């Protein structure tokens, strides 16, 4: 039976915090919906102390920002975007339009149609999340989205140059220096100066994730991507240092980021906890990582690989780092995860920044029912049908007529009956089932 050597914060405390977030976000969305640009300006000044003449960057301002980024950093951004673009294109290539004759004269098909306009949120509060621009903007461009707008909060009193560069290189049509719930609301609801989009994508803190949840339906969303989560699955083929490093590597995202170790070795579990404490003494971002580990860190010891799989599927973590003798066992048996990182040679940071898979992934157990952001999220699979012969229309119509009457839909039945009469030459009584 799985046993905890360390538990995270009590669930009731988490629920109370979530309720407070919901209330705050609801108020901000209502304010933006009512007051539009005036609300955006007021909220930006309140939360970010940012009140520019125009939140949208001009071409000259974009070029100025890019000029402030070192050449090597620009080259690294281009390299990372090339990896994301390549994998997204390979994924898109697997999505084929379909047309098939299912019965003589009956043609069914589907087409993959890009969403028309999207808004990409790029976090930049605690850290400038340059990579989030690659994941949303580049992927949307591969999908064929026509209008891509992007928002990121100000960083130290202005646009973050590297984020602007990544947005521009990725293919954003409009770039705004605007953060938080107000940015998401502006893109989704529209203002006097920002035309609304059809879909909001990108990760963010608990407030951004809640804003997306509340806006879903008025616009589409990619998924609910809240504070980062990581699960490290390990056995005694690795040591405590590498496990602790991978746990803290994601815990540093912020004080509410869960980091969990799942192992079948109690010695490794205790070694890892000791290593976490040692590394927190020298880690520059220990303030965030240490708080996350104290409040949301967990260590679970299992008796077998099968039990580890069961626990991992229960947790349904955003990131799952597998460092065992047989990592493919988890690839073949796990069902609930955002993305798997198999073997000690890879790690979550590779996926976060550069390897090419998308880092916008499901959190809070959403991996039970969805995967992460990918090119397919920007494509609507839309079906069509056509009937090309009189015989086919009459034959399908007879079945349809009877099935409609079975459900009590007389007008539905007449849609079928009129075609049975016209194309099949049958005499069917009005609003009655075809015999």
Residue ranges with predicted function:
Residues 1-116:
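N-terminal Rossmann-like NAD(P)+-binding subdomain of aldehyde/semialdehyde dehydrogenases
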Residues 2-7, 174-179, 299-304:
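Short acidic-hydrophobic, aromatic-tinged amphipathic segments that line or gate anion-handling sites
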Residues 94-100, 220, 257-262, 282-293, ...:
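Flexible, glycine/charged-enriched surface loops at secondary-structure junctions
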Residues 101-165:
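Conserved small-residue-rich beta-alpha loop and adjacent elements
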Residues 171-258:
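Conserved NAD(P)+-binding/catalytic subdomain of aldehyde/semialdehyde dehydrogenases
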Residues 223-295, 299:
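A conserved active-site cap/scaffold subdomain adjacent to cofactor or substrate pockets
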Residues 305, 313-435:
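C-terminal core of ALDH-fold dehydrogenases
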